[in-house]
């Protein structure tokens, strides 16, 4: 409430919480270690333990891991896409791990494990000229389609009029008692590729493991969804209360530090000269009475309100588990 021109401070306690958690995650960057299931697997496990770190390093997974943790801390869910990229290593192909935008992913409502979803869709807006360059048969067939996806609110104007929505559709079929992962890529009504139309892939499927190539990493899980909630959801109420109390304290401080006066209408005091602290003389008309001008008293703020603010900040630290970091302690 109050004047729309009032100062509206926004403190960074919630941001500081997320920064601290992200730093902890990067300090604890995982290294893959493959353990054998039986003694005969020991050699293969040791070989994989040496190969996987190199694979992840070549894929710059540390950068992907950092991006995913930002998403996980803020929105409560990070999604990794694990694909086979035929263009890597000069056409030999290699594994590619990407951090996915959950706004571009769609699955069956109500499932907690995406592998139980009947279908899974991954969407992306791609410039039309890029699509025509790769698939010349799309010339003249691309336009503004009816499908829309959620987008972030950008400071800049992002023009998507010359872009088309490309959909990667994953679904399962049964073949000889085995679950087969099928894949279809299309834009509008134009199918760009489908495993069921490929004789070499129809029986085998897109990937041998038969699973959707997406891994959901949830911070605080919720029922009925593979996503969860993050520290923004957990601490935004306390952050809002801290900012409101900061605003009230700051308004009181500014009111006390900015002198204001009651002036009688017939007090005959030159207000402009009185308000100008650089002028040593102030003109008046007639006798200047004690009640001609009087300062406006601003009640001093009781220390209990500052204590409530500090307690609210401490509550956020405790809620987010950041108390040890803020006080210089260690968790060990």
Predicted regions and their residues:
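Extended alpha-helical, oligomerization-prone segments that build pores/tubes and scaffolds
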Residues: 1-332
């Amino acid at each position: 409430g109050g004047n729309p021109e009032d100062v509206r401070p926004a403190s960074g306690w919630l941001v500081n919480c997320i920064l601290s958690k992200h730093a902890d995650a990067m300090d604890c960057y995982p290294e893959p270690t493959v353990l054998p299931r039986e003694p005969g697997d020991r050699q293969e496990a040791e070989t994989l333990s040496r190969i996987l770190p190199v694979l992840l390093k070549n894929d710059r997974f540390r950068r992907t891991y950092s991006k995913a943790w930002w998403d996980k801390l803020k929105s409560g869910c990070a999604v990794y896409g694990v694909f086979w990229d035929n263009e890597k290593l000069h056409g030999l192909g290699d594994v590619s791990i990407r951090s996915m935008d959950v706004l571009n992913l769609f699955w069956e409502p109500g499932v907690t494990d995406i592998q139980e979803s009947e279908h899974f869709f991954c969407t992306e807006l791609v410039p039309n000229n890029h699509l025509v360059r790769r698939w010349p048969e799309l010339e003249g067939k691309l336009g503004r389609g009816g499908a829309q996806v959620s987008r972030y609110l950008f400071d800049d104007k992002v023009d998507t009029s010359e872009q088309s929505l490309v959909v990667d559709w994953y679904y399962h079929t049964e073949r000889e008692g085995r679950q087969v992962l099928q894949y279809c890529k299309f834009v509008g009504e134009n199918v760009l590729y489908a495993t069921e139309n490929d004789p070499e892939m129809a029986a085998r499927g897109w990937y041998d493991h038969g699973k959707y190539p997406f891994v959901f990493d949830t911070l605080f899980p919720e029922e009925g969804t593979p996503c969860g909630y993050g520290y923004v959801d957990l601490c935004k109420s306390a952050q809002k209360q801290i900012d409101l109390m900061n605003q009230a304290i700051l308004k009181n401080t500014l009111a006390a530090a900015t002198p204001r006066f009651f002036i009688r209408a017939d007090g005959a005091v030159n207000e402009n000269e009185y308000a100008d602290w650089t002028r040593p003389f102030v003109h008046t008309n007639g006798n200047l009475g004690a009640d001609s001008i009087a300062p406006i008293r601003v009640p001093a703020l009781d220390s209990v309100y500052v204590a409530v603010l500090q307690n609210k900040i401490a509550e956020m630290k405790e809620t987010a588990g950041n108390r040890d970091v803020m006080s210089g302690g260690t968790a060990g």
